[in-house]
């Protein structure tokens, strides 16, 4: 049986819109992503609401600060029983390690996942704006190696780096792929996109899918279609 899961990105600006959307998924045990837009505008009540519905939470806040601040931020989030929290690999080894330490200290099973390069970033943008001279793939692999050294649970990357990340860090090192689109979907602001089947073939553990599901006329049907392709 596959351990792969589809995570639905709840890219809404209100709890009311979120609840109306989730009501379409009666009898489905979901894994959902709460990002900055939803969390910052609605606060902790959105975590309570989704947990009360029995869904798993990927809290994608991309924490990036000094190690002590990130430690206490993660520690504070442990009381809400979130399943995944993201931190920026660019924060460095100590910051990443302190994020994981906060989970250990609270005796929780929350996964800490590192952000490598955003799927909206092209190689040219990375090289000219971030002043990173390597290839984009090498930058992602370097961040993944750092994440492994820091003892966190995995990373977020595009589909196209996934297999090499697994080869470098082992199959138990989790990889989450955003930027998932079906053939007929608009790629929007994503530059490095792929299909659910691509992600499956590249050995991803999770895919994050937002607009292709949330903007569809039948979100449940589209979710189940994508789930069949990936899981």
Swiss-Prot record:
Q: What is its EC number?
A: 4.1.1.23
- An example Gene Ontology CC term for this record: cytosol
Which top-rank group of organisms is this from?
Answer: Bacteria
What the entry lists under Pfam families is as follows: OMPdecase
Which positions does UniProt annotate for substrate binding?
11, 33, 60-69, 119, 181, 190, 210-211
Q: List the InterPro entries.
A: Aldolase_TIM, OMPdecase, OMPdecase_AS, OMPdecase_bac, OMPdeCOase_dom, RibuloseP-bd_barrel
> Would you kindly state one Gene Ontology biological process term found in this protein's UniProt entry?
'de novo' pyrimidine nucleobase biosynthetic process
Which residues carry out catalysis? 62
Q: Name one GO molecular function term.
A: orotidine-5'-phosphate decarboxylase activity
Q: In which pathway does it act?
A: Pyrimidine metabolism; UMP biosynthesis via de novo pathway; UMP from orotate: step 2/2
| Catalytic activity reported | orotidine 5'-phosphate + H(+) = UMP + CO2
Per UniProt, which keywords does this protein have? Decarboxylase, Lyase, Pyrimidine biosynthesis
The UniProt record lists the keyword Transport: no
Q: How does it assemble?
A: Homodimer.
Q: Which family does it belong to?
A: Belongs to the OMP decarboxylase family. Type 1 subfamily.
Described by its record, this protein's role is as follows:
Catalyzes the decarboxylation of orotidine 5'-monophosphate (OMP) to uridine 5'-monophosphate (UMP).
For this protein, the record's HAMAP family field holds: OMPdecase_type1_B
Q: What is this protein called?
A: Orotidine 5'-phosphate decarboxylase
Q: What species does this protein belong to?
A: Malacoplasma penetrans (strain HF-2) (Mycoplasma penetrans)
């Amino acid at each position: 049986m596959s351990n792969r899961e589809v995570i639905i990105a709840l890219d809404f600006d209100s709890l009311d819109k979120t609840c109306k959307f989730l009501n379409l998924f009666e009898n489905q045990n979901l894994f959902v992503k709460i990002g900055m837009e939803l969390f910052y505008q609605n606060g902790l009540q959105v975590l309570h609401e989704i947990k009360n519905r029995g869904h798993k939470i990927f809290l994608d806040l991309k924490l990036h600060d000094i190690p002590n601040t990130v430690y206490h931020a993660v520690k504070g989030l442990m009381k809400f029983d979130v399943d995944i929290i993201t931190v920026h690999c660019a924060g460095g080894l100590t910051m990443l390690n302190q994020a994981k330490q906060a989970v250990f200290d609270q005796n929780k099973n929350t996964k800490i996942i590192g952000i490598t390069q955003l799927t909206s970033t092209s190689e040219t943008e990375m090289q000219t704006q971030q002043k990173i001279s390597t290839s984009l793939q090498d930058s992602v692999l370097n961040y993944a190696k750092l994440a492994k050294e820091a003892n966190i649970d995995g990373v977020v990357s595009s589909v196209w780096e996934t297999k090499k990340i697994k080869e470098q860090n082992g199959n138990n090192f989790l990889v989450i792929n955003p930027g998932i689109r079906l053939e007929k979907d608009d790629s929007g602001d994503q530059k490095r996109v792929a299909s659910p089947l691509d992600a499956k073939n590249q050995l991803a553990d999770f895919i994050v899918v937002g607009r292709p599901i949330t903007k569809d006329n039948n979100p449940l049907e589209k979710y189940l279609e994508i789930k069949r392709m990936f899981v």
